[in-house]
Amino acid sequence: MTVGLGMPQPPAPTLAPRRATRQLMVGNVGVGSDHPVSVQSMCTTKTHDVNSTLQQIAELTAAGCDIVRVACPRQEDADALAEIARHSQIPVVADIHFQPRYIFAAIDAGCAAVRVNPGNIKEFDGRVGEVAKAAGAAGIPIRIGVNAGSLDKRFMEKYGKATPEALVESALWEASLFEEHGFGDIKISVKHNDPVVMVAAYELLAARCDYPLHLGVTEAGPAFQGTIKSAVAFGALLSRGIGDTIRVSLSAPPVEEVKVGNQVLESLNLRPRSLEIVSCPSCGRAQVDVYTLANEVTAGLDGLDVPLRVAVMGCVVNGPGEAREADLGVASGNGKGQIFVRGEVIKTVPEAQIVETLIEEAMRLAAEMGEQAPGATPSGSPIVTVS
């Protein structure tokens, strides 16, 4: 039996067809049902610190981020947008709250899109016409970003709290104002920190419009909790074709958000799979320390960006079968490991040599695929300096 490397051809099917939407361009990244679901993150730097912000954007880009958002709370941040947008490797979205003048500054600076929060921008309804005209002239989209924590007080008073209906009504009200001014390049988010409320809001929104949807669980929490919340919510929606771009919100470095986002999309066959480690959860049958083995293999292959499935199995029950189905694998037992490549046993090695052997074979397979191994390029994060 021969198992081919990488993703099957044609690509594995998804659970549901994408919801049909209008199409937008955020810089060179398409957003909408005709385009792949994209991954976003947001810089944690002070935007006016241009070098630090560009450095973080470079790190996010290297991690697989498609679109990046930057905060713009002060004039000095608005003044830095043009330089950031000019030097960023990926499209930059300006995140605007409170001051409408920063919307126009972001458009003039060449940002690829602007996110507006209708719940806290002063007298925003009365400025929509100006914003629509400026964004239309620049050819950039607007994201109407409704958030449970800053919901427009009119809808808070009407519904009593940030219900799915309140979030959706707020978003569609603002969208209707833009449409009245002939502007339709809109994407929408209706974020809540409760994934159940968030999913209900996006389901309602998806049924009522054809705008592309930006998915997010706001204030999701620390890395572990936030990952679970986001994965549950995104999986519930994306598996039914709802969602066109995602941002995982974590109290963690932004690169971790990108890693989680990419893994969610890969798990749903919405993005070509990269390196995947398959390992058993261990039990009383395990004859090796599976946890340590899997962690050491993962660490040794960190940075290897190939569609390669590596199975690390701890016993003879499921081990041989899983190892055969992977591109590369080991079935361990009795102080040794059988190494499988493309479904065939190529060697048996002592337990102490399993990690080293798996890494060597992974590098060899990567070379066959024309990929560079970790360390083949200068190590460390990309360095960006703007003088």
UniProtKB/Swiss-Prot annotation:
Listed name of the protein: 4-hydroxy-3-methylbut-2-en-1-yl diphosphate synthase (flavodoxin)
Cofactor binding: number and manner: Binds 1 [4Fe-4S] cluster.
Binding positions for [4Fe-4S] cluster per the UniProt entry: C280, C283, C315, E322
A matching Pfam family: GcpE
Gene Ontology biological-process annotations: isopentenyl diphosphate biosynthetic process, methylerythritol 4-phosphate pathway; terpenoid biosynthetic process
Cofactor: [4Fe-4S] cluster
Enzyme's top EC category: oxidoreductase
EC number: 1.17.7.3
Gene that this polypeptide is encoded by: ispG
Top-level taxon of origin: Bacteria
Catalytic activity: (2E)-4-hydroxy-3-methylbut-2-enyl diphosphate + oxidized [flavodoxin] + H2O + 2 H(+) = 2-C-methyl-D-erythritol 2,4-cyclic diphosphate + reduced [flavodoxin]
Keywords: 4Fe-4S, Iron, Iron-sulfur, Isoprene biosynthesis, Metal-binding, Oxidoreductase
Matching InterPro entries: Dihydropteroate_synth-like_sf, IspG_bac, IspG_bac-typ, NO2/SO3_Rdtase_4Fe4S_sf
Pathway: Isoprenoid biosynthesis; isopentenyl diphosphate biosynthesis via DXP pathway; isopentenyl diphosphate from 1-deoxy-D-xylulose 5-phosphate: step 5/6
GO MF term list: 4 iron, 4 sulfur cluster binding; 4-hydroxy-3-methylbut-2-en-1-yl diphosphate synthase activity (ferredoxin); 4-hydroxy-3-methylbut-2-enyl-diphosphate synthase activity (flavodoxin); iron ion binding
Lineage: Bacteria, Bacillati, Actinomycetota, Actinomycetes, Mycobacteriales
Annotated source species: Mycobacterium bovis (strain ATCC BAA-935 / AF2122/97)
Family the entry assigns: Belongs to the IspG family.
